[in-house]
Amino acid sequence: MNAQALVITDNAAKKVRQLRDSEGNQDLMLRVYVTGGGCSGFSYGFNFADSPNEDDAEFVNGDVKMLVDSLSYQYLVGSVVDYIEGLEGSRFIIQNPNATTTCGCGSSFSI
């Protein structure tokens, strides 16, 4: 898998560092995945992992690693993972060039 196929922005990496610090575990990695559901057919999910799975692709920004499983990878190739703060709250977002439609909340999409 191409290591440049997904990008984690500096803002997202900074937030991951803050969350790792608050958990007291510098080995945590951000896992990004796609599941069926949501109002547009697919939903994005985020959680932390202590170690990669055998089929994970790893993407790096400085000392921050992002993991994507092989099934989710096909839906996320070319995407940018960012972190935004605004009036609507703070959250990780994905700018996905493969999505043909995106839900207003930004966490659901279709291809």
UniProtKB/Swiss-Prot annotation:
Q: Which cofactor does it need?
A: iron-sulfur cluster
Binding of iron-sulfur cluster occurs at: 39, 103, 105
Q: Does the keyword Iron-sulfur apply?
A: yes
One example of a Gene Ontology biological process annotation? iron-sulfur cluster assembly
Query: Which residues are listed as membrane-spanning?
Result: none
Q: Which domain of life is it from?
A: Bacteria
Q: Cross-referenced InterPro entries, in alphabetical order?
A: FeS_biogenesis (IPR000361), FeS_cluster_insertion (IPR016092), FeS_cluster_insertion_CS (IPR017870), FeS_cluster_insertion_RrpA (IPR023063), HesB-like_dom_sf (IPR035903)
**Which Gene3D superfamilies does the record associate with it?**
HesB-like domain (2.60.300.12)
- GO molecular function list: 2 iron, 2 sulfur cluster binding; 4 iron, 4 sulfur cluster binding; iron ion binding
Q: Per the record's keyword annotation, is Iron included, yes or no?
A: yes
> Which UniProt keyword terms apply here?
Iron, Iron-sulfur, Metal-binding
What HAMAP family does the database record attribute to this sequence?
A: Fe_S_insert_ErpA
The record's similarity note reads: Belongs to the HesB/IscA family.
Question: What is annotated about its quaternary structure and interactions?
Answer: Homodimer.
Q: What functional role does this protein have?
A: Required for insertion of 4Fe-4S clusters for at least IspG.
Question: What is the name of this protein?
Answer: Iron-sulfur cluster insertion protein ErpA
Q: Which organism is it from?
A: Acinetobacter baylyi (strain ATCC 33305 / BD413 / ADP1)
